[in-house]
C-alpha cells in the first residue's frame, strides 16, 4: 500500500479539483485524490471508486516491481564486488547486463500487466461517458 494513503486521508481538499501528490517513494507513482462533489450520484461514486481502485492496483504493481528490482540489483552488485574486490566498482557495462537480464526475466509479467492495464482502462470508457453526460446535464440546469 502507498505510504501516502494513510496520511493523505487527513488532508482537507478543495473539492473542485483532483489532487496529485508527489511520487510514492517505492512505486514512483503519484497518488491521485479524486474530487468528491457534494451531490455525487451513485454512478459518479462507482466511477470514482473504480478509478481509485485502478490507481491503487497500478501503484501496487510498480511497488512490487521496484522492490524486486532494487533487491536483485543489490544482490548483483554485492556478488560482483566479491568477485572484483571490495574497492572496485561495478561497471556500467556489467550493470547493463543486469538490466537486460532483469527485463528479460520480467517480460511475461510486464506483458500480463500491460494487457490488464489496457483492459481495466478500456472498461472505464463507458462509465466515464455516462458520468460526463450526467455532469453535462447537471451543469446545463444551473
Curated annotation (Swiss-Prot):
Which Pfam family is an annotated match for this chain, by its short name? COA8
Keyword Aminoacyl-tRNA synthetase attached: no
Example of a GO cellular component annotation carried by this entry:
mitochondrial inner membrane
GO BP of this protein: intrinsic apoptotic signaling pathway
**Bilayer topology annotation:** Peripheral membrane protein
UniProt-annotated location(s): Mitochondrion inner membrane
Q: Which UniProt keywords apply?
A: Apoptosis, Membrane, Mitochondrion, Mitochondrion inner membrane, Transit peptide
Spell out the family assignment given in the record's similarity comment: Belongs to the COA8 family.
Protein role: May be required for cytochrome c complex (COX) assembly and function, COX being the terminal component of the mitochondrial respiratory chain.
Protein name listed in UniProt: COA8 family protein CBG23705, mitochondrial
Amino acid at each position: 500500500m502507498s505510504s501516502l494513503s494513510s496520511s493523505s486521508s487527513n488532508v482537507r481538499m478543495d473539492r473542485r479539483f483532483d489532487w496529485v501528490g508527489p511520487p510514492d517513494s517505492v512505486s514512483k507513482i503519484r497518488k491521485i485524490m479524486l474530487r468528491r462533489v457534494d451531490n455525487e450520484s451513485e454512478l459518479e461514486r462507482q466511477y470514482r471508486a473504480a478509478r481509485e481502485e485502478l490507481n491503487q492496483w497500478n501503484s501496487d504493481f510498480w511497488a512490487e516491481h521496484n522492490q524486486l528490482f532494487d533487491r536483485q540489483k543489490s544482490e548483483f552488485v554485492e556478488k560482483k564486488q566479491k568477485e572484483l574486490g571490495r574497492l572496485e566498482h561495478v561497471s556500467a557495462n556489467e550493470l547493463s547486463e543486469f538490466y537486460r537480464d532483469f527485463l528479460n526475466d520480467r517480460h511475461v509479467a510486464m506483458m500480463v500487466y500491460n494487457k490488464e492495464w489496457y483492459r481495466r482502462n478500456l472498461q472505464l470508457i463507458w462509465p466515464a461517458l455516462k458520468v460526463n453526460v450526467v455532469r453535462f446535464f447537471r451543469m446545463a440546469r444551473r
